[in-house]
Amino acid sequence: NPLLVSVRSGARKSMPGMMDTVLNVGLTTKTREGLIEKTGNPRFVYDAHRRLIQMYADVVMEQEQGIRPADGDGIREQLEAEMSKMKKARGVENDVDLTADDLKELIEIYKNKVKKVLGVAFPDDAKKQLWGAIAAVFHSWNTKRAVAYRRIENIPDEWGTAVNVQTMVFG
């Protein structure tokens, strides 16, 4: 019975789109088997896992930890390119047309790409994912876009933000 959570800002005043969020935290190779058993829907689970890898690699690994890809393109764009390659190879136009097996394969492609491009493996450990996501949300308080938004909206810097960790609800 895996516990998946979202990690979001709990700023005193809402700052729409300014603060980072990470969804599906806690989904690992081990926990996804329990989620497949619980939902009976492997495609849903593999899609949630690949989305976590993409979001985490971008928000936590690249942005928060400051790891920059050597070739210039951000990790999110590179992972989206891998998705496009797979859709083309399978002769489909939409993400939803990929099968559970396609998405399972894409997860491994994503993990390999993250390791190659960022030089660090995607954490297949729920606690590491959680602490990384929490740090990223706190860090997003001081991004250029968040600081600029606070200036425009007269939100004091010293207010800071909280981090909300909430159980994921799908439906």
What are the roles of these predicted feature ranges?
Residues 1-171:
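Nucleotide/phosphate-binding sheet-loop regions of phosphoryl- and nucleotidyl-transfer enzymes
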